[in-house]
Each structure stands twice: as structure tokens, then as C-alpha cells.
Amino acid sequence: MQGRLIGVVFCMTILLGALSGSVAQAQPGPPPPPPGGPLPPPPVPAANPITPQKVILGKILFWDEQLSSDDSVACGTCHLPAFGGSDPRSFTSAHPGPDSTFGNGDDIFGSPGMITLDCGGTPIDDPLFGFERQVTGRKSPTMIMAAYAPTLFWDGRAEGPFVDPENGVILINNGGALEAQSVEPILSSVEMACETRTWNDVRQKLIASPPLALATDLTPDIVAALAVNPDYPALFASAFGTPDITAARIGFALATYQRTLISNQSPFDEFLAIGPAALTPQENQGSQLFAQNCFPCHAGPLQTDHSFRRIGVRPVQDDLGRGAITNFGPDNGDFKTPTLRNVALRAPYFHNGGKETLQEVLQFYNAGGDFPNPGLPPNGTNLNPQERNAVIAFLETMTDPRVAAALPPFDHPTLQTYLRRGDANQDEVFDVSDPILILEHLFGGPVSLPCEDAADTNDDGVIDVADVMRGLDRLFGGGTPLPLPSERSLGPDPTADSLGCN
């Protein structure tokens, strides 16, 4: 009886946490999401109502690598539903951090973006990354449930107003954070753009590019849309009435698509609906420990209060976070509190990708943070191993199986394969085992190569002994870096040949 009472109180607390925030911001919009939890509809700005035509245009844009200058990065490249809307490549993709030196304790694990390019397509020797792909200075946050957030990015720099990027006219006075966020990466020379890219460059490229020409396994809704409107001008005309492609319309469409990405069919949602009977004893224990230690930052069905807090992930001077946006000293080192929905899929964690597992995250909170901070109890949470396991079991109930399996509305096309040149065995490291595997493939019998493009070490379109020699020269002879995407980078193979990659 006592356990049921605690569960009911917990559910009511969660529900009240949501209703005090999100409902107040909601404006007339689409029907509520499918049944699964007490989530209100996401707020929708009146200037950008949801329509099926805008949703499908936004979905196509979100998953089209041609939206980047070099055809290698889509929005979805760094925001994969099966990984909770974030980027698993962060485990092996490092930014050197504020000291600009790789391998020190301040490295950041972000997302590979662009090779530094001029807009004629010529690579530029970047002071941090050379001719390799740049890595973002923060880990990619999730786009799932972003529709509910009043501010976006880790520092909250995408806020309520949405200003037309091409003429400075305010298009949305309040509630346009998703539109504002959606357009920023497209001109970022780290994420998707050559150095001096303009919106006219984007426009002309989309006019000339067959939608999703580089992707495979197009989803049924995309196939149906392209059968009627096979090019971008036609898609924009269907969504907006005229074929004009503008930055504002791109932002409107991307935001509209993301407002359909509502995760509300998890075991956690069943728990909110019927109480402790939905969970195992371990998960129920975890829910009670969670309520005692993780409120109010992670409360309500959204599992975030949208606040900015400094919790001691890194020293303040490493990254001012919110303080760099507000220019208000007390905000220095504060970062946005993320939703915990689908958190079990989203490793690594925190804005710097600094914790690889949920166990490491809970140990961080147990210790009261890694660095001095005002945002956590000074003595930490003091959970024992059994209690930490229970909290993790509860956090895992927040995984929506549709997200994990990339089922509608989280389904998407397959993007180009990212590979590391020379990594023939696909273990994410280029080492002597790779030329050995190529030798076994060539001379040792029926040994398959999981990625022929990666095994093509010299990028001549043929797997032969020259690839073995090129790899050994790079490993032991001081040879030059391998052809792009080199052994130090990740990316699609820029060379058209008959080789493939599973």
C-alpha cells in the first residue's frame, strides 16, 4: 500500500511539473500525439502551422546530405533516432578542447562535421584539424522532443524570436526556437558549410539537386511525396504555395518535421498512466530514488525543467555556456538541462561527451560533480551500487521502442556510410590488424571484408597488395595520411567506384 501511494504521489508530481510549464506555452496546433502518456501537444507558433506538406518537406531536408556544401552531412547525420536523437560517433570523435591540444583532459567528444573548405571546394589546412573533418565543440543534443523546448542548443542561444536569416524581418515573435535552431548549422563552416557559404548558395544547390539523391531505403511517405513532387521547387510549392526556396521556409519546414518527433510510448509513459504496476520492483525502487535525488531538474513527462545549471562537468573557464549568451556572470558555466527521455540510447553524456555510460553519470552525481559548482548538493547523492542500478533500470523505462527501432515517425532513409580509410576490419581503429586482414582476403582463402571502401587504403578503386603496402607505410614508415576520409577521420568515400561498404 505504501509503495503504491508513493508511486501515485510521484506520478502526480511529474504530471504537475509538466502542466506548470508546457501547457502554458501551448498555442493552437495539431491534434495531440498518439496515446501513451500525459503529454500536451507541443506548442506551435501561429506563423508556422503544421501541415502534411511541410512535414514531408522538412523530413526530406533533414535527411538530405546535399543540404551540406560537400554532400557529406545531413541534419540526421548527427541526430539518429536509434541513438536517442544524438550521435554515437562522439565516442571516437574528439575536439581538442580549450587548450587546442589533443589528448589532454579537456578534450570534447562531439560530432564530425565538415573538412574546412573554401566554396570552390578546395580544402583548407585547419589549425586544429588539418585536412580532416572538424569536430563540434559540444556533443549533439537530441532533436526528439525539441518541440517542447523554449530555448535550444546547450547554451540556449536559439530563443523565442525567429528572424528571417536573409532580410532580418522578425517572422515569429515568440515560440520560434526550433525554427531559429534549424537554420544555424546550414551555414556553419564546422557543421555543414564551406567557409563563405550564403543562403543563395544553398538555394541554387537545392534547385539543382534531386531530393535525397545520395540516400537509400527511402521511407514510404518520402517515396509517395517524391512521386508527386520530384524536385525541391515542387516540394516547396506544395508546402508553401510557390516554388521559392528561402532560408525562412527551410527553417519552417525543418521545425515542422521536428514537431512530429514526439516520444510518448515508453514503459515510463505506461507508468505515468497506471502507476507502479507498470514497472518491475527494481524499476519502482529506481523511480523513488530518482524522485528523491533528481527533482526538480528532471521532472514532468518531459523529464526536464528547461533550466540552465552548472553542475561541475568541467571548469567554468573551459566553456562559458549560457553566460556567453546572456553576458551575465552568474550564468557562466551553465548548460541546458536535457530531457531524459531515451537517455539510455544517447551515450556519451553531458555537453562535452565526457561520460561514456549511465553508471559513470551516476558516479559523477554521487561525487557531487567533477569540479566545483553551485548546482549540486556538496556531498553528492551517495547512492550505493544496487541503488544506482535501480535508477538506471528506471531510466531505461524512458526508452520509446519506436525511437530505438527507428519506426514511424522516427523512420528515415539510410545515409551514406561513414568510414575510416584503412580500417578494413571496421573496429574503428587503423592498426596492423587491418593490412593483415587485407592479406588474408587476398591470399588466405574466403575472408570477407566488411567495408571494401575502407580497405581500399590507397583509394584507387581496387583491393590489392598495394593497399597493404600503403597501410604499412603509413603505420611504420612515416608515410603521408591516407586519402580522405583518412585514418584520422570519418566520412563517406568521395571517390566513385565499384567498391561498397556494409
What are the residue ranges of the model-derived segments?
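Cellulosome-associated attachment modules in secreted, modular CAZymes
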Residues: F410-N502
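Periplasmic c-type cytochrome electron-transfer domains
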Residues: S22-Y418
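Bacterial N-terminal signal peptides
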Residues: V8-G21
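N-terminal secretory signal peptides that target proteins for export/translocation
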Residues: M1-R4
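Residue-level detector of intrinsically disordered, flexible termini
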Residues: G17, V23-Q25, G58, L484, ...
